[in-house]
């Protein structure tokens, strides 16, 4: 905790009044489950709160920044900014991956590098910051960490692999592409979906994500890479 507090102070000039909130934000369910007798809180509830305030602040920013863009374009851009992969990247930028508390099994299986865990951690931190400092503090933090990348156009260039896969396969004539949910795990506010992509009934790729759309994109990316190598 001391190293985390030092990092937040040095990087963002942040000092939490309620250190319990900060500790909870960095505690994964696997760690809490391994220490049940200590009745340690995990970060899922804070993640739920952080997701909501993140959506609000990014939505307000995009609405103000791009007054002539239609709702559909704004929604697509927002989804790219707040998707699991992006949030995990922001968590790594902030070096949050160094401080999360994981259970031994999760640690051994590579949980510290898993996008799902890091994306959830980033949202949980925002939830803790909201409760401790208020919405303006969250906004200030996001404007330091996220907005510069948005303004640099990083999320305008995100590849739509579902479209790329369709275009690749249609070179050889009509094909049937279907996306099938393989599994759905986690609590209602933090679902994790696993989706397979079928090409003419043949499984070609699989992906995971916090929404069906994100999982479909990951599956399409996996399939696109396989089909590209077999076509050329």
Curated annotation (Swiss-Prot):
It is found in: Cytoplasm. Keywords: Cytoplasm, Endonuclease, Hydrolase, Magnesium, Metal-binding, mRNA processing, Nuclease, RNA-binding, rRNA processing, rRNA-binding, tRNA processing. The keyword Disulfide bond does not apply. Its cofactor is Mg(2+). Disulfide bonds: none annotated. Mg(2+) binds at residues 47, 120, 123. Residues 160-229 form the DRBM domain. Residues 213-232 have a biased composition (Basic and acidic residues). GO terms for biological process: mRNA processing; regulation of gene expression; rRNA processing; tRNA processing. Homodimer. This is Ribonuclease 3.
């Amino acid at each position: 905790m001391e190293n985390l507090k030092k990092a937040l102070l040095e990087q963002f000039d942040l000092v939490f009044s309620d250190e319990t909130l900060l500790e909870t934000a960095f505690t994964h369910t696997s760690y809490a489950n391994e220490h049940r007798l200590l009745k340690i809180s995990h970060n899922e509830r804070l993640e739920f709160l952080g997701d909501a305030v993140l959506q609000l602040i990014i939505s307000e920013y995009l609405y103000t920044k791009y007054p002539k863009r239609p709702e559909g374009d704004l929604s697509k851009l927002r989804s790219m900014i707040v998707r699991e992969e992006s949030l995990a990247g922001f968590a790594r930028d902030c070096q949050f991956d160094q401080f999360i508390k994981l259970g031994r099994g999760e640690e051994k299986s590579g949980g510290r590098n898993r996008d799902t865990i890091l994306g959830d951690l980033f949202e949980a931190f925002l939830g803790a910051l909201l409760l401790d400092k208020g919405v303006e503090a969250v906004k200030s933090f996001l404007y330091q960490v996220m907005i510069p990348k948005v303004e640099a156009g990083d999320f305008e260039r995100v590849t739509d692999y579902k479209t790329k896969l369709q275009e690749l396969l249609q070179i050889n004539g009509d094909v049937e592409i279907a996306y099938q949910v393989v599994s759905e795990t986690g609590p209602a506010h933090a679902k994790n979906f696993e989706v397979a992509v079928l090409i003419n009934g043949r499984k070609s790729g699989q992906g995971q994500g916090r929404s069906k759309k994100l999982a479909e994109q990951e599956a399409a990316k996996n399939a696109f890479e396989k089909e590209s190598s077999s076509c050329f």
